[in-house]
Amino acid sequence: MANRNNVTEFILLGLTENPKMQKIIFVVFSVIYINAMIGNVLIVVTITASPSLRSPMYFFLAYLSFIDACYSSVNTPKLITDSLYENKTILFNGCMTQVFGEHFFRGVEVILLTVMAYDHYVAICKPLHYTTVMKQHVCSLLVGVSWVGGFLHATIQILFICQLPFCGPNVIDHFMCDLYTLINLACTNTHTLGLFIAANSGFICLLNCLLLLVSCVVILYSLKTHSLEARHEALSTCVSHITVVILSFIPCIFVYMRPPATLPIDKAVAVFYTMITSMLNPLIYTLRNAQMKNAIRKLCSRKAISSVK
């Protein structure tokens, strides 16, 4: 296989080849990346430092924010630095690392969002059993399952891609390495592999998305027996979670639940689910959550007081 693989690096065309647009891309995506990192790190620090945020919901939210920070760091820094240069290349091993990182963190996030939906279901539909069911060791186990599941998903994907022969061309019409862009460059028949990718990525996204939507429907149906205040709080939680699910899953389903072909819109979709979603998630979960907003205010005021002293 090594003799058939003559490609040592790939050329990335990026979002655009227009020099003026590349300067705009540098500024815009630098702002997006910085905001995403600040927002997600702020949530992790706030939850870790706030005794009032010790429930399983915030435990999972802290991990989700950590994953979002990691996920946005897989491709965004290279996109930003590449916008400063005319020639955009990535080594073969670097390309494989990008693919692994992207699918690892995305796989962890997909499973963790499903875990969070289960947590919401138990909290709203079975409140009397919540502390019994969602014990600390159970929460830690569920997070561990998310990490293992993401690792297995990414490992399976990368093992198949690494075995493909790349004889040239080596030009990728994208700003990052992704499965479909790579298998289209392979000098062998990849039809079966394309179907496998659709099953391993697209079908998993679709299945988890349906499970999440069903859980939300069950939760909303059960709210008719709750008080008005409880309904409002539960509805706010569900709306935030449904919004994040839609932002995370719809692009995944669009990209992978189709034949292995690259479309012009794929770049815009990739920007959305690799960068924009990671920036929006902290806003979605904090703007509608009074406890999070209060905890952030207390943390900021504490830091301000300590800096004055």
From Swiss-Prot:
It is a multi-pass membrane protein. Residues 48-55, 119-137, 218-233, 288-309 are cytoplasmic. The chain crosses the membrane at residues 24-47, 56-77, 99-118, 138-156, 194-217, 234-256, 268-287. Residues 1-23, 78-98, 157-193, 257-267 are extracellular. GO terms for molecular function: G protein-coupled receptor activity; olfactory receptor activity. Pfam families: 7tm_4. Glycans are attached at residues 6, 87. The keyword Transmembrane applies. It comes from the Eukaryota. Keywords: Cell membrane, Disulfide bond, G-protein coupled receptor, Glycoprotein, Membrane, Olfaction, Receptor, Sensory transduction, Transducer, Transmembrane, Transmembrane helix. It is found in: Cell membrane. The keyword DNA-binding does not apply. Disulfide bonds join 95-187. PROSITE patterns: G_PROTEIN_RECEP_F1_2. One of its GO terms (cellular component) is plasma membrane. Gene3D superfamilies: Rhodopsin 7-helix transmembrane proteins. InterPro entries: GPCR_Rhodpsn, GPCR_Rhodpsn_7TM, Olfact_rcpt, Olfactory_Receptors. Belongs to the G-protein coupled receptor 1 family. Odorant receptor. PANTHER family: OLFACTORY RECEPTOR. This is Olfactory receptor 4C13. It comes from Homo sapiens (Human). The gene is OR4C13.
